[in-house]
């Protein structure tokens, strides 16, 4: 009977009593990073009362801390101010309040408060960052020299280096910290940011991937990964085929938009949400640029930059230059965008002033120690030198980065133009022919290639390209290039044909003079090579063209040519 009773209890027969759940304490909320829950608990305890001064102050401090961690710096500042107004308030509260003012971008106020506080390590780090925001270089160096060798001081220094665009210095600090504290995996993201800024996308990609293996749900890391993918795809630079980035870029590139849309469905801090919205516009080829980017400009500097680029890509140079009026560049990339805008505006309006400003901006970026030896830095130097007509130096700079742009049409065109202006027509022609995209259909491309053909003694190729051009305006432009360049290059047969076609559409004295001069030039060549069958055939055709469209002076020219042909027994009569 006793055994049966025991079995019934073991089998769960009979009533069971639920164990009462333990109410969460402050430590539970803090350990789970549930700061909203912690704030609710703290406010409840504060309203309940029955607290002595020490207990109340402790709860208020935790309340301020939770507001701070939620980035609600205004509320945190209010709590710290309330505590500071009490008798015998701890002096370090001023530093905490100054930190709130710093994140509220109230730098002057943060400086004023911090200067009255004890010079603790936290205060020194804060003052160094405040000085950075106020562009006070002297004070930055002063507080830098006061830093110790603690982890916090080293990481603060790395952050300042990053903000000053001293990316390599920041990387060295992060690398040193990781050697002694490999558990600080988050520093991989900081280093990835540095490498991304330095145009080493494959290194940045590997570092972010390493972090995401441990924290796959990090919104910031996911956004950074997608940004690196986007930048790599759109820059069209060559990526090391053996790298993890090269192996994954095609597949991951296909899901960039859906990945970013999924990320935006998460609960994000406002700053991260702004960045993600901005990047989603880029991933969608700026389809919603005009609707989204203007509202983001006050939150994200890149929004203005990309809106300027959007207008430039749409050939809305007037709108782009308008956005530059209130735009004070800080980073080399921002200076590049402003330089490009001034360049385009200067070219469209023939404004030497804007072209000179663009030249100065390009030179400034190219000579900057921050990007001097990067791809962007060398491209900037090349642009400056091109505007300065130093084409041999342009070629030197562009050749130094050619390996990164093996199939990039924009790069090929820039290098080809430099060779063309340097009068190395053979090298220019080879590069122009390698262009494979829509630029081949533009009149500027065809005009430059035609010039190369003519100077490389291939006028027939230039003529054939003109015949395949359907747009009447482009066709006429090509005829003018062929006529003038063939005349200069002593290719008088094609010069005559081109001037003849131009004269049909525009029968001016100038065009007739060009045709007459080309005919006379071909006649002189024939006179020196009387038995050349090609020249005889060409002269026969040109005489026919001159006779087709009579002019007041053409009879004399034809008479001279025919008399010479008859005297020398050369048949130029059809």
Curated annotation (Swiss-Prot):
A matching Pfam family: TPR_19
Keyword Protein transport: yes
Classification via InterPro entries: TPR-like_helical_dom_sf (IPR011990), TTC26 (IPR030511)
Keywords in alphabetical order: Cell projection, Protein transport, Repeat, TPR repeat, Transport
One of the GO BP terms on file: cilium assembly
Localization per record: Cell projection, Cilium
Predominant subcellular localization, coarse grouping: other
TPR repeats: 20-52, 57-90, 151-184
Phenotype when the gene is knocked out: Structural cilia defect: cilia are short and lack distal portions.
Domain of life: Eukaryota
Cellular component, GO, one term: ciliary base
One function term, GO molecular function aspect: intraciliary transport particle B binding
Quaternary structure, from the entry: Component of the IFT complex B composed of at least che-2, che-13, dyf-1, dyf-3, dyf-6, dyf-11, dyf-13, ift-20, ift-74, ift-81, ifta-2, osm-1, osm-5 and osm-6.
Known function: Component of the intraflagellar transport (IFT) complex B required for transport of proteins in the motile cilium. May be required for ciliary entrance and transport of specific ciliary cargo proteins such as che-3 which are related to motility.
UniProt similarity note: Belongs to the IFT56 family.
Protein name stated in the entry: Intraflagellar transport protein 56 homolog
């Amino acid at each position: 009977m006793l055994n049966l009773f025991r079995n019934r209890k073991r089998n769960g027969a009979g009533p069971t009593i639920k164990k009462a759940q333990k109410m969460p304490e402050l430590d539970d909320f803090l350990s789970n990073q549930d700061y909203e829950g912690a704030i609710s608990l703290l406010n409840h305890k504060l309203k309940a009362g029955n607290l002595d001064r020490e207990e109340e102050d402790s709860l208020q401090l935790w309340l301020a801390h939770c507001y701070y961690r939620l980035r609600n710096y205004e509320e945190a500042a209010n709590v710290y101010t309330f505590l500071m107004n009490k008798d015998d308030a701890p002096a370090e509260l001023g530093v905490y309040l100054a930190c709130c003012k710093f994140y509220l971008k109230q730098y002057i106020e943060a400086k004023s408060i911090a200067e009255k506080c004890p010079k603790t390590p936290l205060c020194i780090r804060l003052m160094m960052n405040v000085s950075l925001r106020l562009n006070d270089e002297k004070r930055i160096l002063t507080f830098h020299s006061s830093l110790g060798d603690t982890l916090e001081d080293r990481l603060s220094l790395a952050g300042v280096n990053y903000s000053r665009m001293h990316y390599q210095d920041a990387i060295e600090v992060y690398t040193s910290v990781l050697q002694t504290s490999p558990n600080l995996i988050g520093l991989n993201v900081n280093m990835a940011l540095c490498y991304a800024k330095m145009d080493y996308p494959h290194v940045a990609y590997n570092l972010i991937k390493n972090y995401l293996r441990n924290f796959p749900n990090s919104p910031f890391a996911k956004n950074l990964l997608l940004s690196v993918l986007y930048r790599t795809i759109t820059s069209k630079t060559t990526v090391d085929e053996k790298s993890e980035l090269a192996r994954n870029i095609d597949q991951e590139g296909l899901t960039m938009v859906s990945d970013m849309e999924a990320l935006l469905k998460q609960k994000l801090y406002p700053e991260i949400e702004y960045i993600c919205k901005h990047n989603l516009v880029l991933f969608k080829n700026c389809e919603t640029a005009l609707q989204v980017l203007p509202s983001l400009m006050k939150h994200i500097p890149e929004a203005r930059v990309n809106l300027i680029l959007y207008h430039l890509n749409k050939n809305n140079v007037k709108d782009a230059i308008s956005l530059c009026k209130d735009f004070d560049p800080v980073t080399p990339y921002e200076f590049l965008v402003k330089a490009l805008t001034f360049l385009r505006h200067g070219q469209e309006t023939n404004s030497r002033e804007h072209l000179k400003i663009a030249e100065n901006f390009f030179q400034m970026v190219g000579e900057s120690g921050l990007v001097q030896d990067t791809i962007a830095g060398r491209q900037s130097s090349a642009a400056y030198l091109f505007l300065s007509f130093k084409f041999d130096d342009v070629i030197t700079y562009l050749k130094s980065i050619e390996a990164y742009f093996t199939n990039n049409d924009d790069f090929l065109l820039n290098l080809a133009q430099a060779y063309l202006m340097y009068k190395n027509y053979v090298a220019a022609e080879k590069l122009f022919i390698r262009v494979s995209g829509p630029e081949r259909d533009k009149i500027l491309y065809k005009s430059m290639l035609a010039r190369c053909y003519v100077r490389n003694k291939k006028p027939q190729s230039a003529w054939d390209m003109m015949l395949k051009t359907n747009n009447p305006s482009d066709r006429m432009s090509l005829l003018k290039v062929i006529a003038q360049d063939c005349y200069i290059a002593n290719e008088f047969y094609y010069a005559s044909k081109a001037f003849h076609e131009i004269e049909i559409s525009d029968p001016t004295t100038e065009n007739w003079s060009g045709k007459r001069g080309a005919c006379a030039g071909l006649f002189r060549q024939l006179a020196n090579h009387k038995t050349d069958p090609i020249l005889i055939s060409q002269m026969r055709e040109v005489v026919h063209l001159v006779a087709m469209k009579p002019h007041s002076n053409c009879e004399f020219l034809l008479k001279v040519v025919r008399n010479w042909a008859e005297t020398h027994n050369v048949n130029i009569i059809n």
